[in-house]
Amino acid sequence: SAASDVYKRQEENLEATVVAVVTDENRLEMTWRGDKIVDLSRDFLNTNGVTQHAKVEITSVDENKNYRNEVPTCLESLSLADALKANLSRLEVCSQKGLVERFDSSIGASTVLMPYAGKYQLTPEEAMVAKIPVLEGETDTATVMAYGFIPKLSRWSPFHSAAFAVSESLAKLACVGCDPSQARLTFQEYFERLNDVPSRWGKPTAALLGALTAQVGYKCPSIGGKDSMSGSFNDLDVPPTLVSFAVGMSEASKTVSAQFKRINSTVKLLELPIDDETGLPIYDKACLLYTSP
């Protein structure tokens, strides 16, 4: 019963209040000080109000300006050594350690991977890994979460950006030893104010279609998310943003950290298979790459 559930929560030092009771009468009723102030049919609520429509225009992309195939302008005329140093200072690449240190990653004493690995804690980890809380004993079960988003790619093509965001978040799970085929996704979306401009509506539409394509390709569904369509101030607009968060389960004892484990370690690059015609990941090959031992 609702009352007994409240008592159980109080035993665990959690505040709980009964706010509703589910019945089989197919109606939503709300009372205030003994008076019924709402009485609606569930069938009416299921219609979800008036159906809304918007005109959408998805603009084609310039294949010659694909961010993944371009050398950033600030690096073009530099030598390899100078370009490497300059690249490390770019916002998309530079260290985020100052920001990371503002958050306490040790709360709850369940952290498996600290944000930075290695003797000097300078190697950023690919994902968050933490044991699940248990009332008694010890557990080896851990939750794993990683994100994916490439801002400059998003400006070029929201469709491709969303597909690669999903790919990146799942790849990071694989890097720490979590099986991405069992993961679930949640998306954080942030776009400019759409108004009634079809080309503006086309950006979130393209991003969602790109994310859907990736979900189908990886057989990995998104089960939640949060969106905002208010990213405009005067004549400034946020870039089209769809950040993919991949969440999975793993074993803490099998987690792989990012730092080198010994001298003379071999470093191998496992490239994401890309379709030359579409510029998108080849999902079936990527799945094999992510799940291979």
Residue ranges and their predicted role:
Residues 1-292:
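Glycine/proline-enriched, intrinsically flexible loops and inter-domain linkers
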